[in-house]
């Protein structure tokens, strides 16, 4: 599980991971299960979330992309 903290108006990007065949269908991308996002807590304007996703998907902070 990847754990990220985000503030109001900050984003995450979920996209095919580097090296994944671009011709893969959605069914193939999600063959190992769905994306699961769990809110783990928050303080003020910040929330901590845990994200589980198939290895074919990359999860990145938008400010890093």
Residue ranges and their predicted role:
Residues 1-65:
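Compact, glycine-rich, soluble single-domain proteins
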């Amino acid at each position: 599980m990847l754990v990220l903290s985000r503030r109001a108006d900050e984003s995450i990007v979920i996209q095919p991971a580097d090296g994944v065949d671009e011709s893969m269908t959605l069914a193939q991308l999600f063959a190992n299960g769905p994306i699961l996002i769990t809110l783990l807590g928050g303080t003020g304007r910040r929330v901590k979330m845990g994200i589980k996703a198939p290895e074919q998907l990359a999860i990145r902070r938008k400010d890093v992309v």
